[in-house]
Amino acid sequence: MKKQTQAIHLEYERRDAYDSLSVPVYNTLAYEFDNAAIMSEAFTDKIKAPDYSRVENPTVTNLERRVAALTDAAHATAFNSGMAAISNTLMSLAAQGKNIVTSKHLFGNTYTLLVATLRRFGVKVRLRDLTNIEAVREAIDDDTCCVFLEILTNPQLEVADLKAISEVAHEKNVPLVVDSTVIPFTQFSAKSLGVDIEVVSSSKYVSGGATSLGGLVIDYGTPYNGDFAKRLYGEMLFNFGAYMTPQVAYMQTIGLETLDARYRVQSSNALELAKKLRTLPQIQYVNYIGLEDNPYHELAQRQFGKTAGAMICIDLESKEACFNFLNNLKLIHRATNLFDNRSLAIHPASTIFGAFSENMRRSMDVKDTTIRLSIGLEDVDDLFEDIKQAVESL
């Protein structure tokens, strides 16, 4: 079956009393057992049965199994946010005295998790240019617990060579962990590129309508992962209590079924819009990996296929121009989410990176002159006209 068909049909078996066509929402905390022996076996994992919805729920399990089947993974685990997925993953791999090799180009909260929170627990962080394979090789040593990166950085839109990095990491028995939020896991094969663990903010493309918050950890079960699965599920999930709710899992299952169709339209819209934006003299630079002269275009196509996602960044003359541009928008929404059905715009330097110092933002290549656009399902002509009138009013 093709991915779109799999997303709709995989892993759901109608076993409820009414043969519901859609996955039911099991809005329950606890589950009754026929006798004490079976109850004991469930709690000690001798039999597979849900015992408490803080760690397992049939609605959530269906989403997890569907994601694992779609990605050819060993396991998928659903969390209540993308940051919960990232933090639980890294804490499952890291320990005092260990180090994580990563990039300076990270989502703001991921950056602070690494350089502030985990450092307080004795985990070292090595920030490197991950487009430089030799720099990655030199950074990895016997205490490296993982290499972590975003497959398309936000808002720099930088692409690293996953296959090359995975080969370097695997030479030293180190797993490669990637955040694939900005390119859906249904659109490319992370496993074939050597990725060992994939984390996703399912609040974005999977949710689609910006109505549910969640995260996914996709474990490919490779030899480089060690006891990761045991730690993630048997320790982190149990002890930190960040499991996805059944209501969210139900909504995100519906989102998953339409993800491929939405993504194809959003990517097509983004490419057409990016080309049109180049005709506006007020825009100094259009950054989109779908454009043929983008420095990462060839690598992105090799890794992610012909579609390039729904995120475009544009550079204007100044920070003041960026603020005025946002204020001039009439159709596109000023909001911080990504990959909603609606198109969104934000000034990253003053919002998601606003708590960082100017020097820190500069070191992360977050510019005051950049606007990030998340392209939705609207007609491209309407989006272009809105941006056109916004920049012409500067």
Language-model regions, residue ranges each:
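Conserved PLP-enzyme active-site core in the AAT-like
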Residues: 7-13, 75-280, 287
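Conserved small-domain helix->loop->beta segment predominantly found in fold-type I
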Residues: 271-330, 334-342, 356-362
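Short amphipathic alpha-helical segments
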Residues: 48, 74, 213, 248, ...
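PLP-dependent enzyme catalytic core of the Aspartate aminotransferase-like
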Residues: 115, 124, 262, 320, ...
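Conserved N-terminal alpha-helix of the aminotransferase class I/II PLP-enzyme fold
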Residues: 30, 35-84, 109-116
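Glycine-rich beta-alpha junction loops
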Residues: 12-14, 27-33, 204, 258, ...
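Short, well-ordered beta-strand elements within core beta-sheets of diverse protein domains
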Residues: 251-261, 309-317, 372-376
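N-terminal "arm"/small-domain region of PLP-dependent enzymes with the aminotransferase-like
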Residues: 1-57, 371
